[in-house]
Amino acid sequence: MSTSAQPARRPFFRRRKTCPFSGANAPKIDYKDVKLLQRYISERGKIVPSRITAVSAKKQRELARAIKRARFLALIPYVIS
Protein backbone atom coordinates (compact mmCIF):
# COMPACT_ATOMS: atom_id res chain seq x y z
CA MET A 1 0.00 0.00 0.00
CA SER A 2 1.40 3.29 -1.02
CA THR A 3 0.21 6.56 0.39
CA SER A 4 -0.32 9.30 -2.12
CA ALA A 5 1.20 12.66 -1.31
CA GLN A 6 -1.99 14.70 -1.45
CA PRO A 7 -2.11 17.85 0.63
CA ALA A 8 -4.59 17.76 3.50
CA ARG A 9 -7.85 19.49 2.64
CA ARG A 10 -8.93 22.42 4.71
CA PRO A 11 -12.36 21.89 6.25
CA PHE A 12 -15.16 23.98 4.76
CA PHE A 13 -15.50 27.17 6.78
CA ARG A 14 -18.88 28.87 6.64
CA ARG A 15 -18.34 32.57 7.21
CA ARG A 16 -20.58 34.04 9.90
CA LYS A 17 -23.03 36.50 8.36
CA THR A 18 -23.31 39.91 9.96
CA CYS A 19 -26.57 41.51 11.04
CA PRO A 20 -28.04 43.60 8.20
CA PHE A 21 -29.42 46.11 10.74
CA SER A 22 -26.12 46.86 12.48
CA GLY A 23 -23.55 49.21 11.03
CA ALA A 24 -23.19 52.80 9.95
CA ASN A 25 -25.69 53.03 7.09
CA ALA A 26 -28.02 50.20 8.14
CA PRO A 27 -31.76 50.63 7.55
CA LYS A 28 -34.01 51.43 10.51
CA ILE A 29 -36.72 48.92 11.37
CA ASP A 30 -40.05 50.69 10.89
CA TYR A 31 -43.51 49.10 10.72
CA LYS A 32 -44.44 51.46 7.85
CA ASP A 33 -41.54 50.24 5.68
CA VAL A 34 -43.46 47.36 4.08
CA LYS A 35 -40.82 46.71 1.41
CA LEU A 36 -38.16 46.05 4.06
CA LEU A 37 -40.45 43.91 6.22
CA GLN A 38 -41.49 41.70 3.30
CA ARG A 39 -37.85 40.54 2.92
CA TYR A 40 -38.13 38.92 6.36
CA ILE A 41 -41.47 37.18 5.77
CA SER A 42 -41.63 33.76 4.07
CA GLU A 43 -43.82 33.05 1.05
CA ARG A 44 -46.33 31.51 3.50
CA GLY A 45 -46.47 34.76 5.51
CA LYS A 46 -44.41 33.59 8.48
CA ILE A 47 -41.54 35.53 10.05
CA VAL A 48 -38.22 34.04 8.88
CA PRO A 49 -35.99 32.93 11.81
CA SER A 50 -32.79 34.81 12.61
CA ARG A 51 -30.58 31.76 11.98
CA ILE A 52 -31.52 32.05 8.31
CA THR A 53 -31.52 35.85 7.98
CA ALA A 54 -28.52 36.41 10.33
CA VAL A 55 -30.35 39.18 12.19
CA SER A 56 -29.13 39.70 15.78
CA ALA A 57 -31.44 38.69 18.65
CA LYS A 58 -32.23 42.28 19.63
CA LYS A 59 -33.00 43.35 16.06
CA GLN A 60 -35.02 40.15 15.46
CA ARG A 61 -37.31 41.14 18.35
CA GLU A 62 -37.69 44.65 16.90
CA LEU A 63 -38.35 43.17 13.46
CA ALA A 64 -41.00 40.77 14.79
CA ARG A 65 -42.71 43.62 16.66
CA ALA A 66 -42.70 45.79 13.50
CA ILE A 67 -44.12 42.94 11.38
CA LYS A 68 -46.88 42.31 13.93
CA ARG A 69 -47.75 46.02 14.02
CA ALA A 70 -47.87 46.19 10.22
CA ARG A 71 -50.14 43.12 10.15
CA PHE A 72 -52.46 44.65 12.76
CA LEU A 73 -52.74 47.86 10.71
CA ALA A 74 -53.39 45.79 7.54
CA LEU A 75 -50.23 47.03 5.81
CA ILE A 76 -49.17 43.41 5.21
CA PRO A 77 -51.37 40.27 5.26
CA TYR A 78 -51.35 37.68 8.05
CA VAL A 79 -51.48 34.80 5.57
CA ILE A 80 -50.60 34.78 1.91
CA SER A 81 -53.00 32.64 -0.11
Swiss-Prot record:
<comment type="similarity">
    <text>Belongs to the bacterial ribosomal protein bS18 family.</text>
</comment>
<comment type="function">
    <text>Binds as a heterodimer with protein bS6 to the central domain of the 16S rRNA, where it helps stabilize the platform of the 30S subunit.</text>
</comment>
<dbReference type="InterPro" id="IPR018275">
    <property type="entry name" value="Ribosomal_bS18_CS"/>
</dbReference>
<keyword id="KW-0694">RNA-binding</keyword>
<keyword id="KW-0687">Ribonucleoprotein</keyword>
<dbReference type="GO" id="GO:0070181">
    <property type="term" value="F:small ribosomal subunit rRNA binding"/>
</dbReference>
<dbReference type="GO" id="GO:0006412">
    <property type="term" value="P:translation"/>
</dbReference>
<dbReference type="GO" id="GO:0003735">
    <property type="term" value="F:structural constituent of ribosome"/>
</dbReference>
<comment type="subunit">
    <text>Part of the 30S ribosomal subunit. Forms a tight heterodimer with protein bS6.</text>
</comment>
<dbReference type="InterPro" id="IPR036870">
    <property type="entry name" value="Ribosomal_bS18_sf"/>
</dbReference>
<keyword id="KW-0699">rRNA-binding</keyword>
<dbReference type="GO" id="GO:0022627">
    <property type="term" value="C:cytosolic small ribosomal subunit"/>
</dbReference>
<dbReference type="Pfam" id="PF01084">
    <property type="entry name" value="Ribosomal_S18"/>
</dbReference>
<protein>
    <recommendedName>
        <fullName>Small ribosomal subunit protein bS18</fullName>
    </recommendedName>
</protein>
<keyword id="KW-0689">Ribosomal protein</keyword>
<dbReference type="InterPro" id="IPR001648">
    <property type="entry name" value="Ribosomal_bS18"/>
</dbReference>
